[in-house]
Amino acid sequence: MDVNPTLLFLKVPAQNAISTTFPYTGDPPYSHGTGTGYTMDTVNRTHQYSERGRWTTNTETGAPQLNPIDGPLPEDNEPSGYAQTDCVLEAMAFLEESHPGIFENSCIETMEVVQQTRVDKLTQGRQTYDWTLNRNQPAATALANTIEVFRSNGLTANESGRLIDFLKDVMESMNKEEMEITTHFQRKRRVRDNMTKKMVTQRTIGKRKQKLNKRSYLIRALTLNTMTKDAERGKLKRRAIATPGMQIRGFVYFVETLARSICEKLEQSGLPVGGNEKKAKLANVVRKMMTNSQDTELSFTITGDNTKWNENQNPRMFLAMITYMTRNQPEWFRNVLSIAPIMFSNKMARLGKGYMFESKSMKLRTQIPAEMLASIDLKYFNGSTRKKIEKIRPLLIEGTASLSPGMMMGMFNMLSTVLGVSILNLGQKRYTKTTYWWDGLQSSDDFALIVNAPNHEGIQAGVDRFYRTCKLLGINMSKKKSYINRTGTFEFTSFFYRYGFVANFSMELPSFGVSGINESADMSIGVTVIKNNMINNDLGPATAQMALQLFIKDYRYTYRCHRGDTQIQTRRSFEIKKLWEQTRSKAGLLVSDGGPNLYNIRNLHIPEVCLKWELMDEDYQGRLCNPLNPFVSHKEIESMNNAVMMPAHGPAKNMEYDAVATTHSWIPKRNRSILNTSQRGILEDEQMYQRCCNLFEXFFPSSSYRRPVGISSMVEAMVSRAQIDARIDFESGRIKKEEFTEIMKICSTIEELRRQK
């Protein structure tokens, strides 16, 4: 379809067209191969930014460490990580002066959270470095493996189920002389297949015990595994991201809880709120600066960009901040919070998979694992890789690189925001003591700075002072990438402000379309996305109507469920036509059963089953919503489900959609081939977990067992429930005395077994 693009813009104000320049249609770029090179880049760059710091050696692991704190003040505009402790502490003190009691109150809130948080908090999250297997696993599995190893090594505080007790075990584990772990390994052998008489490779999974000495265990506990960040748009080069292990995660969570609590109280912080709430917060700051810049004052805004925010931050600085913020708090609390930054200043970066070599002439491929990079002859590598390896070699231990300075991506978003806001806070006239003053917004590494002054020289002086203040705290504003405008036009975290926020619709484009979960969820998510964009993103009625028609078309092609009276032939058309002919009320058929689409922009909030219920034939209703239908493995459905939406950039968003259980809410069955891999153990654990949950549900039919509260275990809860129920049933005559006695006997046997365990 040829569209003359200029026609699109005839009636559109220029600022609304900004979103069409974004690279957000089509598939985002994904990375292939190993992330080893990107990780080495990160490690080398981080050390380069701090190169004039002091070198020391970690006494426990022998890792060389670079400490740039209180290092030489920069003399040029190159990025550097030499934060000055006294400056950071002073910035914190001024932040507290402007917000009396902010740290105190946040500490009290955090202490409550620390005492209540369950260890299952750590099961949230995707891939996690599993130190027992030395590779990534889903968070829940990694946690289960860690706890299993802890218990077999005599660390049992975690059995209370509280996160803080699990962390006590982590601390304890670091003092042990050795830790015994169970690792999985694959045996391959060539055997002759009886049927085909061909030779085949048979894989079996073995488990074996392995002892780690204190040094090896510490290295693993302090390791961050690295991967390549996928699906980043608008970038030529990929970059590495880190995933920490279970030892670090709990401590980071508590630090971020404190920092989040502080950010909520700071008007300049763009975190932890999002969406419309964030826009309102930002608009307030802008309004304040505009109204206070009287007719005599000029007001300018910088759309800011910081160079390599993470790589110039320093965990030692975070330790100083935490020490200051918690200074009047109980000793145990200060200790818990200071462990995360201490672990990060001793962190090790795992270099990933290593390099793949292939010889074209001999048709050979071989993998050089990261562990070998320390000793392999460099003649096999090209020039740039050779330089990287030479540079990183002094830092290598057991295939990981010592990385003391810098923070890996996304670890301390909240805490680093507090640091950024503390500089914005210094812009008040009572601190600048001159005619210029500033304010702004900070969200992790993104910032917008609003400077007011009587004349242009004042604006320039204000920006310079801000720039130099940032340098003292290890923040490097990029002079190349930041730009300044009259206040009223700027961009912050992909929100475009032009006398108010302009909808950046292109960011939402990737979430339109069919998600591919199942017929029921996809229909629901599809219409919800359109509805949400009408509410939040200026999606007009005509465009929404068109989006809806395109979505239905896309949906029908995806699930091959064209209307029963169509001419289109697909694999499903025979069944769909048959159903169409048998159905009296054709409007009642779901779109996924070849029915017509009854959605329009007025009824997007109603689930399709509800929309068509009154129009359905009775036997169709019975088949559609029958939990006993043998052809469906049913998902237990809550009234709301969550879909993970990937906006064009920024973190994945959770989107709620209505979930009505029908025979279309199927879950795809697991692929058999998983049973032959090292993941098999995980599968068995999952099934075990599933059986336990089913059993638990039989005792507590209405339960949602995801978050057990209180310290008693599932077994204790079931036993006491059985005893109570049995007594009630016996007293009301529903069961006989013999049955009652038998139940009580079984219960006491279980309790006895628990005690012996």
Curated annotation (Swiss-Prot):
PROSITE patterns with a match to the protein in the record: RDRP_SSRNA_NEG_SEG (PS50525)
Primary subcellular site in the record, as a coarse category: host cell
GO cellular component, one term: host cell cytoplasm
Keywords: Eukaryotic host gene expression shutoff by virus, Eukaryotic host transcription shutoff by virus, Host cytoplasm, Host gene expression shutoff by virus, Host nucleus, Host-virus interaction, Inhibition of host RNA polymerase II by virus, Nucleotide-binding, Nucleotidyltransferase, Phosphoprotein, RNA-directed RNA polymerase, Transferase, Viral RNA replication, Viral transcription
Catalytic reaction annotation: RNA(n) + a ribonucleoside 5'-triphosphate = RNA(n+1) + diphosphate
EC class (word): transferase
Region (Disordered): 53-82
UniProt key word Hydrolase: no
Highest taxon, organism lineage: Viruses
Modifications after synthesis and translation: Phosphorylated by host PRKCA.
Residue numbers spanned by region Promoter-binding site: 249-256
Subcellular location: Host nucleus; Host cytoplasm
Residue positions of motif Nuclear localization signal: 187-195, 203-216
Keyword Phosphoprotein listed: yes
GO MF assignments: nucleotide binding; RNA binding; RNA-directed RNA polymerase activity
One Pfam family here: Flu_PB1
Single GO biological process annotation from the record: symbiont-mediated suppression of host gene expression
EC number: 2.7.7.48
RdRp catalytic domain: residues covered: 286-483
Compositional bias ranges of the Polar residues kind: 55-64
Function: RNA-dependent RNA polymerase which is responsible for replication and transcription of virus RNA segments. The transcription of viral mRNAs occurs by a unique mechanism called cap-snatching. 5' methylated caps of cellular mRNAs are cleaved after 10-13 nucleotides by PA. In turn, these short capped RNAs are used as primers by PB1 for transcription of viral mRNAs. During virus replication, PB1 initiates RNA synthesis and copy vRNA into complementary RNA (cRNA) which in turn serves as a template for the production of more vRNAs.
Family: Belongs to the influenza viruses polymerase PB1 family.
Subunit composition and interactions: Influenza RNA polymerase is composed of three subunits: PB1, PB2 and PA. Interacts (via N-terminus) with PA (via C-terminus). Interacts (via C-terminus) with PB2 (via N-terminus); this interaction is essential for transcription initiation. Interacts (via C-terminus) with human PKP2 (via N-terminus); the interaction competitively inhibits the interaction between the RNA polymerase subunits PB1 and PB2.
Name this polypeptide is given: RNA-directed RNA polymerase catalytic subunit
Annotated organism of origin: Influenza A virus (strain A/USA:Phila/1935 H1N1)
Recorded name of the encoding gene: PB1
